[in-house]
């Protein structure tokens, strides 16, 4: 599928009622990242924007300026440190400068692209799974297709070390809607009244409160082959 077809296929299962056009300045993004980004990701930002599918954060490219701290630029250093720490995905010779994050969450999974060449729309997805060995796996699909196949269980097995979205379609909520709900005393994801309102200082509840990933201690690397799904 091309990028437009992939985002349309994703919209067939993942409602965008609580999404919003991120209105990204793609020229500024390319200047910050030294690369353009795949078309399906750009389409996702136009339809859904940055936010969460349940516990899976889809990162906007740049900081939002509204207190929601997750962004691709904020996660690059930690994501690449994980790649270096494990020596990358088994069977992949590319260095850490060739991986770029786009998602995070679901019990410490980190998602990104392996920048394999100039054809951005052919970049496969790489995933770091905290509870798997080897930690890194490679999937021969783009970001939008990955999300769709995760929620429709179309991989041979769950590509994450967390089953919360495996074969189950979550709810997407844009980061601005999450913040609005939080300050209104509502649960940022469900919109239901939050019984804990007023007990804590009101910081954005669903946004990750870190600028970079927390890199865990190194573990012995397995010699298993790359886990790939086609």
Region locations from a protein language model:
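A short secondary-structure junction signal
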Residues: 110-115, 124, 137-139
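A surface-exposed partner-binding patch
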Residues: 1-109, 159, 176-229
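A short local loop/turn or secondary-structure capping micro-motif enriched for an aromatic residue
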Residues: 120-122, 134-135
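Compact, glycine/acidic-enriched structural inserts
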Residues: 127-157
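Short loop/turn segments at secondary-structure transitions that flank enzyme active sites
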Residues: 51, 108, 119, 152-153
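Helix-boundary capping/turn motifs
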Residues: 18-19, 118-121
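Low-complexity, glycine/alanine/valine/leucine- and proline-rich hydrophobic stretches
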Residues: 114-119, 127-129
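Extended, acidic-biased charged interface segments
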Residues: 146-177
